Amino acid sequence: MGVPAGNAENGKKIFVQRCAQCHTVEAGGKHKVGPNLHGFYGRKTGQAPGFSYSNANKAKGITWGDDTLFEYLENPKKYIPGTKMVFAGLKKANERADLIAYLKESTK
């Protein structure tokens, strides 16, 4: 299927509105309700040091990348049944693509 090209500036707005209450992205950022996302791109699920993940997240065993994030962000609880993440998801493909573009830039 492939992930459409996203706009990182739009993605930042989505992150601030929908994600920042539970996640940080900067190096050395604190865990909140959800883990700090710095360095998560290319890492397996449930691996942020010092964060207490659900068994479902630890056991999923996928690597975060464009395709996995695109599917996960549509419906997190469907993609990882048992996840602690309470976010309902982003149904619009362009919003998911924008958020992914922002996360790729901001979590390096």
UniProtKB/Swiss-Prot annotation:
UniProt-listed Gene3D superfamilies: Cytochrome c-like domain
Query: What is the name listed in the Swiss-Prot or TrEMBL entry for this protein?
Result: Cytochrome c
Q: Which GO terms describe its molecular function?
A: electron transfer activity; heme binding; metal ion binding
Alphabetically ordered keywords of this record: Electron transport, Heme, Iron, Metal-binding, Mitochondrion, Respiratory chain, Transport
Coiled-coil annotation reads none
Q: How is it modified after translation?
A: Binds 1 heme c group covalently per subunit.
Subcellular location per UniProt equals: Mitochondrion intermembrane space
Q: Name one Pfam family in it.
A: Cytochrom_C
**Function, in words:** Electron carrier protein. The oxidized form of the cytochrome c heme group can accept an electron from the heme group of the cytochrome c1 subunit of cytochrome reductase. Cytochrome c then transfers this electron to the cytochrome oxidase complex, the final protein carrier in the mitochondrial electron-transport chain.
Residues holding heme c: C19, C22, H23, M85
Which family is it part of?
Answer: Belongs to the cytochrome c family.
Cellular component per GO? mitochondrial intermembrane space
PROSITE patterns named among the record's database cross-references: CYTC (PS51007)
Q: Which residues cross the membrane?
A: none
Fetch the InterPro entries from UniProt.
Answer: Cyt_c-like_dom, Cyt_c-like_dom_sf, Cyt_c_1A/1B
